[in-house]
Curated annotation (Swiss-Prot):
Keywords: Membrane, NAD, NADP, Plastoquinone, Quinone, Thylakoid, Translocase, Transmembrane, Transmembrane helix. Disulfide bonds: none annotated. Belongs to the complex I subunit 4 family. One of its GO terms (biological process) is electron transport coupled proton transport. It comes from Picosynechococcus sp. (strain ATCC 27264 / PCC 7002 / PR-6) (Agmenellum quadruplicatum). InterPro entries: NADH_Q_OxRdtase_chain4, NADH_Q_OxRdtase_chainM/4, NADH_UbQ_OxRdtase, ND/Mrp_TM. It comes from the Bacteria. This is NAD(P)H-quinone oxidoreductase chain 4 2. Its EC number is 7.1.1.-. It is found in: Cellular thylakoid membrane. The keyword S-adenosyl-L-methionine does not apply. GO terms for molecular function: NADH dehydrogenase (ubiquinone) activity; ubiquinone binding. One of its GO terms (cellular component) is plasma membrane-derived thylakoid membrane. The gene is ndhD2. Pfam families: Proton_antipo_M. The lineage of its organism: Bacteria, Bacillati, Cyanobacteriota, Cyanophyceae, Oscillatoriophycideae.
Length: 526
């Protein structure tokens, strides 16, 4: 059977959304049928993603593939336009994988399960759409689509301060989204041609002053999601009140939307401004790494400690994408994928621990590892992954960013030494706060009342399965990173070459390849 013209991405996006609409029709009193229905939909969509990847994606092609383009509003060239390249395909795979596991992690949810899984499936399709759409206005719509499910999940199934956390989340993200809308309209209507097509917009000459204005606005919008200091304060509050599956989606997917958008739009569509903003991104990345690591060390709430750890790790993404080297840009992509897996595993463990101890305060834990051997092993392994132990994905990703930036000829040797030193301080702080966290949770001082509690049972098969599914790719990438880097290498190398042509100090040495716009654009279907 020939699948060359099959609408893979439209199917992947719309299938979970359409399936969610049938959830209210399912007769279910105890929530079991709804759980299995949602899990089945998640698995089927993930299988479709994997099938599309193996049948229609070419590693060596840096341009968009699996392209579909259907005219929506002809007057302004508004289209349902989707496609995947090296920037988006790995994150689409990551979304399908983590969301399916998050549905399985949501098994204990008993309050309004139909609504909960309905929102989960909406997020599934919406998140993939963010990574796949190639129309600026459509991107804005899908970006906004994420706000409603996340807000409702936080405000209905969150903790005591859930309304505060949910409101803060939506105010930050909606405020940032205004910059996306303004930038989309400005870029679309600038010049002689009115178009929202990203490829066509990338060919427009905005002039450096307008590029800088657009870049600054988009940096604020995407910096909220990444998040970048000082736009990060919503994240610890959101994580502090969210449930385990919501944690997995926040850390595993939602933060990656910010990193992806910075690469796709700021770097890909505004390369001259990205070159000038490079030092700013590097400094912000170092601030993220060091500040968040120090703040995480001071946290006594387990969820907030891991949340600040996530902020710290995302600093490497900023440094990598501003290194203007193939290795650094590749490391930024790998760090997003790696942290998606590691962050999801850590927050799943937070949820599993809270279900047993009913506390998030480290002072009230202690000694639980003696009674729960599987939980002990799972916590230890996930923490080793987070502190970038050699042989795990985090080590490879951070090493690539370090070496990529240290060897970058876009910055002076003095600046590179200072940045590498400061980032190394953050790396040293990571095992300090993670190992101290493990000591307080698993060892002592022992909370005798907690350890003696009859509900303090070890991990069940479902929990072991979820963690095993996350640890296998974490270790696999650590041992053989090429399995993942080859998916996006041609695209990131092409992007880096174009960016290097925009760096003032490299303009005479960098030769950027020309993009074949005909390949990036799909034939019009009316």
């Amino acid at each position: 059977m020939n699948f060359a013209n099959f609408p893979w991405l439209s199917t992947i996006i719309l299938f979970p959304i359409i399936a969610a609409l049938f959830l209210p029709l399912i007769p279910d009193k105890d929530g079991k049928t709804v759980r299995w229905y949602a899990l089945t939909i998640g698995l089927i969509d993930f299988v479709i993603i994997v099938t599309a990847f193996y049948t229609g994606y070419d590693f060596g092609n840096p341009n968009l593939q699996l392209v579909e383009s259907y005219t929506w509003v002809e007057a302004i060239d508004l289209r349902w336009s989707v496609g995947a390249d090296g920037l988006s395909m790995p994150l689409i795979l990551l979304t399908g994988f983590i969301t399916t596991l998050a549905i399985l992690a949501a098994w204990p949810v008993s309050f309004k399960p139909k609504l909960f899984y309905f929102l989960m499936l909406l997020m599934y399709g919406g998140q993939i759409a963010v990574f796949a759409v190639q129309d600026m206005l459509l991107f804005f719509f899908t970006w906004e689509l994420e706000l409603v499910p996340v807000y409702l999940i936080l405000s209905i199934w969150g903790g005591k301060k859930r309304l505060y956390a949910a409101t803060k989340f939506i105010l930050y993200t909606a405020g940032g989204s205004l910059f996306i809308l303004i930038a989309a309209l400005t870029m679309a209507f600038y010049g002689d041609t009115v178009t929202f097509d990203m490829t066509a917009i990338a060919q427009k000459d905005f002039g450096i002053n307008l590029q800088l204005l657009l870049y600054g606005g988009l940096l604020i919008a995407y910096g909220v999601k990444l998040p970048i200091f000082p736009l990060h304060t919503w994240l610890p509050d959101a994580h502090g009140e969210a449930t385990a599956p919501a944690h997995m989606l926040l850390a595993g997917i939602l933060l990656k939307m910010g990193g992806y958008a910075l690469l796709r739009m700021n770097a890909g569509m505004l390369p001259d401004a990205h070159a000038l903003f490079g030092p700013v991104l590097v400094i912000l990345g170092v601030v993220n790494i060091v500040y968040a690591a120090l703040t995480s060390f001071a946290q006594r709430n387990l969820k907030r400690k891991i949340a600040y750890s996530s902020i710290s790790h995302m600093g490497f993404v900023l440094i990598g994408m501003a290194s203007f080297t193939d290795l650094g840009t590749s490391g930024a992509m790998l760090q997003m994928i790696s942290h998606g897996l590691i962050g999801a595993s850590l927050f799943f463990m937070v949820g599993a621990t809270y279900d047993r101890t009913h506390t998030l305060m480290l002072d009230e834990m202690g000694g639980v590892g003696k009674k729960m051997k599987k939980i002990f092993a799972m916590w230890t392994t996930c923490s080793m992954a987070s502190l970038a132990l050699p042989g795990m994905s985090g080590f490879v990703a951070e090493l690539m960013v370090f070496v990529g930036f240290a060897t970058s000829d876009a910055y002076s040797p003095t600046f590179r030494v200072i940045i590498v030193f400061l980032a190394a301080v953050g790396v040293i702080l990571t095992p300090i706060y993670l190992l101290s966290m493990l000591r307080e949770i698993l060892y002592g001082p022992e909370n005798k009342e907690l350890v003696a509690h009859e509900k303090l049972i070890d991990a069940e098969p479902r929990e072991v399965f979820v963690i095993a599914c996350l640890l296998i790719p974490i270790i696999g990438i650590g041992l053989y990173p090429k399995a993942v880097t080859q998916i996006y290498a041609s695209t990131t190398e092409n992007l880096t070459a174009i960016l290097r042509q925009s760096v003032p100090s490299l303009q005479q040495t960098a030769q950027a390849p020309s993009l074949d716009v005909a390949v990036l654009r799909a034939p019009e279907i009316r």
